[in-house]
């Protein structure tokens, strides 16, 4: 598989970008040149080349994540286990940000 040359959009495919890996992708992107001529157009136009690049980049990130899955912390639950006052909190958003008590403005003496 040929290495994609970003100044030649016709060489950009999802599989060629994915095969670079993340390190190779960053190096190839940093070393890329401007498109000086239109002698190598992508079959689906510039947007097609961009789409192929993004798909290949996403696939390379997925491969990187899978390759290092054993070297990362296990995902942790966002909320603590069953809290005694869970019934007081709304069932959406970040539960820890809501007080389990009803919050009211302090009343000033002499006002209704």
UniProtKB/Swiss-Prot annotation:
SUBUNIT field: Interacts with the major capsid protein/MCP. Interacts with host TSPAN7; this interaction may be responsible for the presence of TSPAN7 in extracellular virions. Interacts with host MAPRE3 and DYNLT1; these interactions mediate retrograde transport of viral capsids.
Compartments (UniProt record): Virion; Host nucleus
Keywords for this protein: Capsid protein, Host nucleus, Host-virus interaction, Virion
Function: Participates in the assembly of the infectious particles by decorating the outer surface of the capsid shell and thus forming a layer between the capsid and the tegument. Complexes composed of the major capsid protein and small capsomere-interacting protein/SCP assemble together in the host cytoplasm and are translocated to the nucleus, where they accumulate and participate in capsid assembly. Interaction with host dynein light chains suggests a possible function in the retrogarde transport of incoming viral capsids.
RNA-binding found in the keyword field: no
Superkingdom: Viruses
Family: Belongs to the herpesviridae small capsomere-interacting protein family.
InterPro entries: Herpes_UL35
Gene this chain is encoded by: SCP
Keyword Transcription regulation: no
GO CC annotation terms, alphabetical: host cell nucleus; viral capsid
Gene Ontology BP terms: viral process
Chief localization: virion
Name of the protein this chain belongs to: Small capsomere-interacting protein
